[in-house]
A protein has these predicted regions:
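Hot-dog-fold acyl-thioester-processing enzymes
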Residues: 1-81, 150-153, 160-226
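HotDog/MaoC-like acyl-thioester-processing domains
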Residues: 1-14, 79-170
């Protein structure tokens, strides 16, 4: 069935409890590549509890995951994550319980050929005192659901890559088993466990992407400072 604008805009949950342990945060860090060099204290702090375990800021994307749009009527096989962002109010603790408010924030009809854009906002606060922890936003592109008659909305500006050199470049090699390590962070699915044969005849794990992190060989992260 086609998606319904009024129904989508009414979707929200309040105070959903999300509990996580230090085992969860540690496993996430291993899954995205930390711990390749156990002698590096900067890596060890994210994968060993005796080192004063820290939580990666990007773990917020996992804590914000939910089933809010599971039955919204879109053609799920043609849905892709368009963009996401996280704003931290304070560091995420290594273990704890959060109360998360989620809602569909935006819905725009880009036309039958372009699809629909659906934005979800998740705001998390600590259960014990209500202090804000983070706000996560995701925009989904439902490629098969455009032309449903909803408002087009204002088109967001494209992200333009800077032409100058990055402030910092840190290339790192992804372990061959990293996709397998990352799977249990989200769910045990076949994705990320299938093997593919590369052009040179070598067999390797298929690239796996979830929770805002792409796991693939020879990845390089570039961060702009300031």
């Amino acid at each position: 069935m086609p998606i319904d604008y009024e129904h989508l805009m009414s979707l929200r949950t309040r105070g959903e409890r999300v509990h996580y342990t230090d085992r969860d945060t540690l496993l996430y860090a291993l899954g995205v590549g930390f711990g390749r060099n156990p002698g590096n204290p900067n890596e060890l702090a994210y994968v060993a509890e005796h080192a004063g375990l820290k939580t990666l800021p990007s773990y917020a994307s996992i804590l914000a995951s939910n089933t809010l749009l599971d039955d919204c009527g879109w053609e799920a096989s043609r849905v892709v994550l368009r963009d996401e962002s996280v704003v931290l109010d304070r560091p995420i603790e290594e273990a704890g319980a959060l109360l998360v408010d989620r809602e569909v924030a935006t819905v725009s009809d880009q036309g039958a050929d372009e699809g629909a854009l659906i934005g979800v906002a998740s705001r998390a606060r600590r259960e014990q005192d209500g202090q804000a922890v983070f706000t996560a936003r995701r925009t989904w592109l439902a490629r098969g659901d455009g032309g449903f008659g909803g408002p087009r909305g204002s088109s967001s500006s494209r992200h333009i890559l800077p032409t100058r050199h990055p402030d910092m470049t840190h290339p790192c090699e992804t372990r061959a088993d990293q996709a397998l390590l990352f799977r249990p962070v989200v769910s045990f699915t076949l994705e990320g466990a299938d093997t593919v044969v590369t052009d040179d005849g070598e067999s390797s794990l298929e690239r796996h992407s979830a929770g805002g992190v792409a796991v693939r060989p020879d990845i390089a992260w570039r961060h702009r400072i300031g």
